[in-house]
Amino acid sequence: MKHLLGLRELSKEDIIKILNLAKDMKTILKSETKKTPHLQGYSVVTLFYENSTRTRTSFELAAKFMSANTTSISVQTSSVQKGESLLDTVKTLEALKTDVLIVRHAVSGVPHFIAKNCSFSVINAGDGMNEHPTQALLDMFTIRERLGTIERLKIAIIGDIFHSRVARSNIWGLSKFDNQITVFGPQTLIPPYIENFAYVASSLEEAVSGKDVVIDLRIQLERQKRGFITSKQEYYKFYGLNEDIMRYISGSTLIMHPGPVNRGVEISSEVLQLPNSTIDEQVTNGIAVRMAVLYLCTRKEGIYR
């Protein structure tokens, strides 16, 4: 497995292999030392052109727990601020003997561009509105761990579908396992082509009723200057997960969110604290999944053919 650029190009068997290995990695996380030599001698670099807490820290911990040499580049203090191009930046990292680059960028397709122009492995940590493959993988891992399967489930994805790379990766991944996927959100935030891949519900009540999993998405407030929603208060009233809407959701239905959470906008604090809320579990599972991805990307034999 040379790269992980997206779930669209992975097979069902590829995903299962990653999830199975992540289960083994989680056993390591539960040990007292949380340490394995699998990446000893490897150089792992994180290059984030967008802000991140969970993904960046999770990747860095995953690499360190596997004994890699890790470096985190702050774009704000790098030569990017002097006008250095993306290509020159990654070519510099190649000359510095990087083995794995974990990259996040606001422009879709950047990880694919880097993979075509450099010799090291590339892991996509989020590219524009395209994909966020490791977030979807950790979501799938969490679902399988809680429910025992990721096949033939009824899954709702609620919120800002239009801008969400998390939604796209989850749809690409979950659709390979014969799941019924429903989406719902403001009409301005539902892509016109989404009906080819998921059922579009007409109300929040319809969207969440009878579901095994509800994935709530972050409203990307940094994009709201374009007027996709009228106000945060109105969004919460019609699309937020609160105590009233929980009447339509079973106590066994998983409530998921990729984070960061805008409390009182997408979801209430009370719902976040329910036993069927998996948000903290998702963060922990993210380390195990990213350990698995790093392991596979540094092995000559792999799942990419």
Swiss-Prot record:
Cystine pairings recorded for this chain: none
Record EC number: 2.1.3.2
Enzyme type, top EC level: transferase
Entry annotated with the keyword Flavoprotein: no
Keywords annotated in UniProt: Pyrimidine biosynthesis, Transferase
GO biological process: 'de novo' pyrimidine nucleobase biosynthetic process; 'de novo' UMP biosynthetic process; amino acid metabolic process
Domain of life: Bacteria
Subunit-level organization: Heterododecamer (2C3:3R2) of six catalytic PyrB chains organized as two trimers (C3), and six regulatory PyrI chains organized as three dimers (R2).
Biological function: Catalyzes the condensation of carbamoyl phosphate and aspartate to form carbamoyl aspartate and inorganic phosphate, the committed step in the de novo pyrimidine nucleotide biosynthesis pathway.
Protein name, as recorded: Aspartate carbamoyltransferase catalytic subunit
Lineage of producing organism: Bacteria, Bacillati, Bacillota, Bacillota incertae sedis, Caldicellulosiruptorales
